[in-house]
Amino acid sequence: MARVTDKITHLIKPVIEGMGYELLGIEYVASGKYSILRIFIDTNKSISVNDCEIVSRQLSSIFDIEEPISGQYNLEVSSPGIERPLFHKGHYQCFLGFNVKLHMFRPISGQSNFFGVIGSVSEINNTIELVGELGAIILDIDLIKKANLVVDF
């Protein structure tokens, strides 16, 4: 689905930025008859429900014309929330030392899910060091399907 999200990113990023928000990332979940398109936005102040509604209406108008996804889907515009999703290398860099849960595109040594602390980010190799209970592991950022911060209470 990377192609769909890349196409949508190219289409909506200038619009969202023009409205004063940052496009954090996009999740597209193809789920039978009704797929879900999640757009995560942020700003230097908190995101309100009203902000999400304004962006959603603007994007709906664009999607009605451009039709980047065939078939029916639900559009969700959201703030990143407390368990913030991480989409890009810069996101991992911003949250060094934070707990994360990672889900990989394919198993690594028989494991698809990882939990630990972001120890470091390599700009050169496009990898992160994840420090967990069993020690440190180096993971390729391009192989991470989904990543979220994990909050300890």
Curated annotation (Swiss-Prot):
Localization of this protein: Cytoplasm
Key words, A-Z: Cytoplasm, Ribosome biogenesis
Any Pfam family hit: DUF150_C
InterPro entries attached to this UniProt entry: Ribosome_maturation_RimP, RimP_C, RimP_C_sf, RimP_N, RimP_N_sf
Domain of life: Bacteria
UniProt key word Cytoplasm: yes
GO biological process, one term: translation
Predominant cellular place of this UniProt entry's protein: cytoplasm
SUPFAM superfamilies listed in its UniProt record: YhbC-like, C-terminal domain, YhbC-like, N-terminal domain
Record flagged with keyword Repressor: no
Record's GO cellular component terms: cytosol
Similarity comment text for this entry: Belongs to the RimP family.
Cited function: Required for maturation of 30S ribosomal subunits.
PANTHER family: RIBOSOME MATURATION FACTOR RIMP
Name by which UniProt lists this protein: Ribosome maturation factor RimP
Organism: Vesicomyosocius okutanii subsp. Calyptogena okutanii (strain HA)
Biological classification of the source: Bacteria, Pseudomonadati, Pseudomonadota, Gammaproteobacteria, Candidatus Pseudothioglobaceae
Encoding gene (name): rimP
